[in-house]
């Protein structure tokens, strides 16, 4: 199907309804009127690949743009090399069916097309005519009448180009009034049949074009069935288990044997009691019978208009039916959204699943290119290339030299170290109860829902299995196998290096990983073994504590007129490159030995993985280094491995897992030399422990007015100077004012608001406020205590986002901002930032956030006045960036709080007391 949409955004619901009911495989669209603010996910139709190319000429008014929807089983591969011809509004993809390949294209030639633009179009046609091609589009030659083969001077070059390239034009009816604007060209007319010009697409003034593409595609209905774990009769299953003597059936002295017997029982229960359900019908969830009836009435009215010889009277009737159909369609969608919102307390998953489908479409992988530059056109080949790449980054460990690791554990290894582990049934039962039943099953096919429902029955045999596994230091092979899902990061989708592997492993194996991890973490915390510079995967530390701790040092040094240099470091494929023998040595230096260490050694040994794309899998590859991304235990092992990274450094260092940064005040060349020496030590550490830096991404930011901007080397590479850098998602710039971060947060928040406005039909307070709180406001408040704006323009611009959000609510549009906030139960963003400041101080004082409190605050010298006992001393600051940083700005507000608020025994209690205090204070005013 091809259509000139004249804006797809306001017709997307109707398009989805039409293609599902008519079972359309390919949809070519011109005049999409899309722009960069509109996300792919907003245009997503489940089961289809969506490709787009928006108008690039910013000087032109809105309009233009082309797109193609292709059903996923047709394996659409975008042909980006054809854009080199430089005809701007064109998009191409290849589709394949059983070995046959067809090139599909959509173009839009504007009415005022220049001679240069037309020449580019002719060059494009000349290039694509070498292939089996179908080209759809609005060519905007109104005087051209293909059914009469009449041409005039303006369209003559185009007709000559089509004829010279032996393309065939198939449309023999006008598509807009009496004009032949929309055409379908093909290289072989035998592959196209049943072409007809239909009714206008909704409110567009162009008629749609339908045709059938002949291919070797298997068009038999494939009924896909899945096991439905949420419809099983678990009571009946439990009764059946009572008839089985699991104490006898699930018994053995070997780990693999015991695991095999347990899985056989679980597979038997699965096959016997878990029902199969067919795939949901190809129908939008909000479509009702009434919607379908109105749409058919509209189509019937159009057919009457055509059969009447285009009598105006019948056209007027068609327009009435069209308006009713559009109105009913939108009403049905609004009612569906209201039902989801009203049931949110009992079924929040359905509501947010629906919303998330509008936020992001599932990223398709590729099309990838192999090492020879060949475009891969099937999922199996793509999976193989990705798996080869993921395996290529593994470290070949240098066993000829293993350096001595710093001894972090100072206790008695035998009596105080973590060398053995005994697991009880209560621990296993609790882990089973905590399983997220909505997660996927692992490669072994055992679903978390099944495990959760049978927690009472399974905790005894699993406890036996886990203890045997730990004591023997043996892990079942099933737990060491991973199905890897490639996640796109950024850059070109054609390059395998722009994908990150995430491993899907056995759920049962993850339960034991979790128990082992808990014991390791408890051991590390008890002996205070993890350095305070590490904020990732550690209790009481986070992105926020990392940023606060680091920027406290930066702003303090700048305030006393000391220039400071910040260096951001980037490890290359850090999690995948951890060499095992060196890791085991690090574990020993942290007091982990005996059967626990033996178990970890076995858990990491003989691992293998395969990559899966659309259920097509690569061959298995051995995993020879790294901690599995997606595992439970992996992150803890990683932070142990890099724990001593900064042990010998003088500069200030902050880490979040592998994200590492350092800073040093630079008052002289001697200070710069200290920082250089730290970089030399880091370079040596990376060589000793075989953790490579990605030198292209390691940068230095110079701060301070009198900064001499010294140069620094890491290895043999001079560090690139940067004015700003993204630090854990927050933009840090050389001015330290965070205006760029404000702009970035506003941009992302407005983008999400735009998605909500375009995608959510119902604009009730209930829905908009929920979506604003869940999806928009967090973008404005992520780690905001570390970058809270103090420039008036930034404060105003941030608040404007909430202005826009509350204006979207239909019932609030006539109210001023203050009244809208009251109606919606919202505070200003500025007030929320103050509240967040107070919460963070409370968490620091109470030790909930494990950050050096004395580095931020000093107790007030005279604390005998009214108020609480936790008052803070106020210090003087010279620069605005220091006056307005967290440790300085919070003091007055904190000291004014009454003891009744400060003495709360939990964070939630503090929040409630603070809110009551502020509300009462506002009322008194």
Protein language model annotation of sequence segments:
Residues 102-105, 132-136, 140-150, 212-377, ...:
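Arg/Lys-enriched, amphipathic patches
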Residues 123-136, 516-534, 559, 635-663:
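Active-site palm subdomain of RNA-directed nucleic acid polymerases
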Residues 278, 287, 337-341, 520, ...:
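Non-catalytic, peripheral interaction segments enriched in hydrophobic/basic residues
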Residues 87, 383, 390, 418-628:
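Conserved pre-catalytic core of RNA-dependent polymerases
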Residues 208, 212, 216-218, 242, ...:
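Surface-exposed loop/turn segments and immediately adjacent short secondary-structure elements
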Residues 172-191, 195-197, 615, 677, ...:
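Short, conserved micro-motifs composed of acidic
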Residues 1-130, 143-166, 177, 241, ...:
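Short phosphate/oxyanion-binding micro-motifs
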Residues 141-155, 573-589, 660-684:
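Catalytic palm subdomain of template-directed nucleic-acid polymerases
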């Amino acid at each position: 199907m091809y259509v000139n949409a004249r804006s797809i955004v306001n017709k997307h619901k109707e398009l989805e309804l039409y293609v599902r009911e008519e079972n359309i495989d390919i949809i070519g669209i011109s005049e999409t009127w899309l722009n960069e603010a509109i996300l792919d996910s907003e245009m997503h139709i489940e089961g289809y690949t969506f490709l787009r190319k928006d108008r690039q000429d910013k000087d032109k008014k809105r309009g233009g743009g082309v797109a193609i929807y292709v059903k996923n089983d047709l394996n659409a591969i975008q042909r980006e090399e054809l854009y080199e011809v430089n005809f701007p509004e064109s998009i191409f993809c290849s589709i394949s069916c059983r070995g046959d390949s067809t090139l599909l294209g959509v173009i839009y030639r504007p009415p005022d097309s220049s001679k240069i633009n037309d020449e580019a179009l002719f060059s494009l046609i000349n290039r694509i005519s070498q292939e089996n091609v179908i080209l759809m589009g609005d060519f905007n030659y109104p005087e051209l009448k293909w059914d009469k083969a009449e041409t005039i001077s303006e369209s003559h070059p185009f007709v000559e180009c089509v004829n010279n390239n032996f393309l065939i034009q198939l449309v023999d009816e006008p598509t807009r009034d009496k004009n032949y604007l929309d055409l379908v060209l093909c290289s072989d007319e035998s592959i196209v049949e049943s072409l007809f010009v239909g009714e206008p697409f909704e409110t567009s003034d162009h008629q749609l074009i339908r045709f059938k593409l002949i291919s070797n595609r298997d068009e038999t209905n494939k009924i896909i069935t899945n096991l439905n774990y949420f419809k099983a009769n678990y009571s009946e299953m439990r009764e059946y288990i009572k008839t089985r003597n699991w104490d006898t059936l699930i018994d053995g002295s070997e780990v693999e044997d015991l695991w095999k017997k347990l899985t056989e029982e679980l597979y038997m229960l699965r096959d016997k009691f878990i029902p199969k359900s067919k795939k949901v019908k190809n129908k939008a969830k909000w479509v009702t019978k009434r919607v379908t009836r109105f749409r058919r009435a509209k189509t019937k009215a159009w057919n009457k208009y055509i059969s009447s010889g285009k009598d105006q009277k019948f056209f007027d009737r068609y327009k009435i039916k069209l308006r009713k159909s559009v109105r009913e369609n939108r009403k049905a969608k609004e009612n569906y959204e209201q039902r989801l919102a009203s049931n949110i307390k009992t079924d929040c998953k359905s509501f947010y699943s629906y919303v998330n489908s509008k936020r992001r479409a599932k990223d398709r992988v590729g099309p990838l290119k192999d090492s020879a530059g060949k475009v891969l056109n099937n999922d199996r080949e793509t999976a193989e290339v990705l798996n080869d790449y993921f395996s290529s980054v593994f470290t070949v460990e240098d066993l000829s030299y293993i350096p001595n690791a710093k001894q972090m554990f100072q206790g008695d290894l035998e009596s105080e170290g973590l060398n053995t582990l005994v697991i009880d049934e209560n621990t296993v039962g609790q882990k089973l109860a905590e399983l997220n039943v909505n997660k996927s099953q692992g490669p072994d096919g055992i679903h978390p829902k099944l495990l959760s429902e049978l927690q009472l029955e399974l905790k005894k045999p699993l406890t036996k299995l886990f203890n045997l596994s730990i004591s023997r230091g043996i892990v079942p092979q099933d737990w060491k196998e991973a199905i890897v899902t490639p996640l796109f990061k950024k850059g070109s989708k054609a390059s395998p290096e722009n994908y990150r592997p995430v491993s899907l492993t056995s759920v049962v194996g993850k339960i034991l990983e979790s128990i082992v991890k808990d014991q390791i973490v408890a051991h590390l915390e008890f002996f205070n073994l993890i350095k305070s510079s590490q904020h990732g995967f550690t209790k009481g530390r986070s992105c926020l504590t990392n940023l606060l701790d680091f920027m406290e040092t930066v702003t303090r040094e700048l305030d006393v007129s000391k220039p400071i240099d910040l260096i951001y470091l980037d490890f290359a494929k850090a999690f995948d490159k951890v060499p095992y023998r060196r890791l085991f040595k690090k574990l020993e230096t942290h007091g982990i030995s005996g059967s626990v260490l033996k178990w970890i050694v076995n858990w990491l040994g003989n691992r293998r993985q395969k990559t899966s794309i659309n259920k097509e899998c690569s061959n298995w590859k051995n995993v020879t280094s790294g901690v599995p991304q997606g595992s439970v235990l992996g992150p803890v092992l990683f932070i142990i491995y890099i724990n001593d990274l900064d042990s010998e450094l003088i500069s200030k260092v902050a880490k979040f897992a592998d994200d590492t940064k350092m800073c040093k005040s630079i008052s002289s060349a001697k200070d710069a030399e200290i920082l250089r020496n730290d970089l030399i030590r880091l370079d040596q550490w990376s060589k000793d422990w075989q953790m490579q830096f990605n030198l292209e991404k390691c940068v230095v930011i110079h701060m301070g007015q009198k900064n001499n901007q010294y140069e620094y080397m890491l290895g043999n590479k001079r560090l690139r100077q940067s004015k700003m850098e993204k630090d854990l998602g927050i933009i840090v710039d050389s001015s330290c004012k965070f205006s760029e971060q404000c702009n970035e947060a506003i941009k992302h928040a407005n983008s999400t608001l735009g998605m909500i406005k375009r995608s959510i039909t119902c604009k009730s307070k209930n829905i908009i406020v929920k979506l604003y709180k869940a999806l928009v406001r967090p973008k404005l408040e992520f780690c905001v205590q570390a970058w809270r704006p103090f420039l008036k323009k930034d404060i105003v611009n941030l608040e404007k986002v909430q202005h826009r959000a509350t204006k979207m609510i239909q019932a609030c549009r006539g109210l001023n901002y203050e009244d809208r906030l009251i109606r919606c139960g919202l505070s200003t963003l500025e007030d929320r930032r103050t509240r967040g400041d107070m919460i963070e101080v409370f968490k620091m004082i109470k030790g909930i956030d494990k950050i050096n409190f004395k580095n931020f605050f000093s107790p007030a010298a005279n604390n005998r006045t009214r108020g609480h006992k936790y008052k803070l001393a106020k210090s003087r600051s010279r620069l605005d960036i220091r006056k307005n940083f967290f440790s300085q700005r919070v003091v007055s507000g904190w000291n004014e709080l009454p003891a009744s608020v400060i003495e709360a025994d939990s964070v939630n209690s503090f929040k409630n007391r603070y809110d009551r205090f502020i509300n009462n204070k506002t009322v008194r005013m």
